């Protein structure tokens, strides 16, 4: 299962994903490529694969990304190899921007798309300023982009409002657990159980409607 967590810059999606990974087994993080320089304690291959613009564009031209976009002047993308490799060990969670999420929906219609929202606009502004990573002009650009992205929230499968980190992380965990219990994702397990009852074949579970 592919789980896409997206939302405006500063909404807290990266922090939420880290907490969810600590609370759930069988969940791998898809590491994106980017041309932006590392920030603070970021490590190559952990938060991102940091590459030159030349290398990124060569990869894009070769069709090696399942999604990529220009975000605040830098290139970001998810390689098909990364998604494939991480998917072998279970479910994969992606931390990508709204443009990338739309691309994933087109290529993988079964993906679960979750939009993380700040409680109010003022809180988002406060978080961006509190990071002390960008100047006023960059923050203003991020906030303007956030206004546009928020208007698209209705296109996503789930919305998590990050007004309280603990509650929001539990909401995200609940979404993933619920998706894992869908009958189409339980078919293999159900078939095995049916065999123990002396039955075989596909489970006869009626579809709605």
Each language-model region and where it sits:
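Post-Walker A alpha-helix
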Residues: 16-17
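NTP-dependent small-molecule kinase module
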Residues: 133-134, 151-209
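Post-Walker A helix-loop "phosphate-sensing" segment adjacent to the P-loop in P-loop NTPases
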Residues: 22-30
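Short hydrophobic/aromatic beta-strand immediately N-terminal to the Walker A/P-loop
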Residues: 2-4
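ATP-dependent small-molecule kinase phosphotransfer cores
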Residues: 34-92, 99-102
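P-loop (Walker A) phosphate-binding loop of NTP-binding proteins
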Residues: 6-8
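Conserved lysine of the Walker
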Residues: 13
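Conserved phosphate-donor/acceptor-positioning beta-strand/loop module used by diverse small-molecule
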Residues: 93-97, 106-130, 161-162
């Amino acid at each position: 299962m592919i789980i896409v967590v997206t939302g405006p810059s500063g909404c807290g999606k990266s922090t939420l994903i880290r907490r969810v990974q600590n609370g759930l087994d069988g969940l791998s993080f898809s590491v994106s490529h980017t041309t932006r320089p590392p920030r603070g304690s970021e490590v190559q291959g952990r938060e991102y694969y940091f590459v030159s613009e030349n290398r990124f564009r060569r990869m894009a031209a070769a069709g090696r990304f399942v999604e990529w976009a220009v975000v605040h002047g830098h290139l970001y993308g998810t390689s098909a190899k990364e998604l494939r490799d991480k998917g072998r060990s279970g479910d994969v969670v992606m931390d990508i921007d709204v443009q990338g999420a739309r691309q994933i929906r087109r290529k993988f219609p079964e993906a679960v798309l979750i939009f993380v929202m700040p409680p109010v606009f003022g809180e988002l502004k406060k978080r961006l300023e509190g990071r002390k990573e960008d100047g006023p002009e960059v923050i203003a650009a991020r906030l303007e982009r956030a206004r546009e992205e928020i208007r698209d929230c209705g296109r996503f499968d789930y919305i998590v409002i990050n007004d309280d980190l603990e509650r929001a992380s539990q909401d995200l965990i609940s979404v993933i657990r619920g998706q894992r219990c869908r009958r189409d994702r339980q078919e293999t397990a159900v078939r095995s159980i049916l065999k123990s009852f002396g039955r075989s074949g596909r489970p006869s579970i009626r579809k709605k409607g």
